Every structure is written in structure tokens, then in C-alpha cells.
Amino acid sequence: LLHTIPYEEAGELGEIFKMSKTESKGNTVNRVQQIKKILVAEDVESNFILLKNLIGREYTLLWAKDGVEAIEMYKQYQPDLILMDIKMPRMDGLEATHIIRSYSKEVPIIALTAYAFETDKELALEMGCNDFVTKPVSKEALEKALEKFSV
């Protein structure tokens, strides 16, 4: 019998969604240190909710609503992976990716976009993204991308 604690909202720069403790038949397994952090840079709340539901409760999700917040949250929380929407207000995902790459070459960044042309994919990869998932995002495509980076 598994129970998962519901997420809590917090954070000034964006919002953090935590799923941190699992109970299994009398044994409590505290997974706070093992849970991977995923920064989701997405300006549309319904898209974030969809991603949250597709990803499930095995991760701590950080929500940035634009590229500027994504950079600040990256610096503050050092996520294990970033899902980066390309078209966002204030600063787009490609520019945010380029700036984040000046801090880290290692963190995997997966571009999320409705633009599915090969030139869009090439530009995202050129700007520092490691992978590319087109919207609408399917559970299979997202799982495949996360598995690629062992997240």
C-alpha cells in the first residue's frame, strides 16, 4: 500500500511542487534527497498542469512562468533537468537556454514547442537544448525524453 503526500506550493520566483515522502507497509521511506528536481519553464498554466500530470509524483517540480524566472530558479535551485517552453513572455526559452548554458553545460534542457519544423529543432539544439519535444506533449514522448537523461 503506497501513500504519497500531496504537493505544496511555495516560492517567490515561481512555484515549487513537492512530492517527498512515500510510505510502504509500515516502513517510511524518506526520499527527499533522492527526488530529482525538474524545472518547468512554461507560461501557460494549463500546459504546466498537463506536464505535472504526465510526469507524475516522483519529482519535485519547479515552475517558472517565463525565461527570466527560469534563469533565476535555475541559479537558486540547481535542477536536475529543465523542460523549456520556447515561446514565453519577457524572455523566450532559447535566450534563457543560452544564458543557462553560461552557468552549466551539464544540466539537460529539453525544448517544448508547438513549432515542429526541422529548422526549429536545429535552432533549439544550436542554442543549447539537448532534446526537443513537440506540443501537444504525449506521455510517451515525455517519458522517452526523461529516460534519455536518466531522470
Regions found by a protein language model. Name each.
Residues E42:
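Conserved acidic carboxylate
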Residues Y59-K65, M73, V133:
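Short hydrophobic/Thr-rich beta-strand motif most characteristic of the beta2 strand and flanking loop
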Residues L1-T28:
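C-terminal catalytic ATP-binding subdomain
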Residues Y77-L83:
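Active-site beta3 strand of CheY-like receiver
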Residues I49-G56:
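Charged docking surfaces used in two-component/phosphorelay signaling
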Residues M88:
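Receiver (REC) domain active-site loop signature in two-component systems and cognate sites
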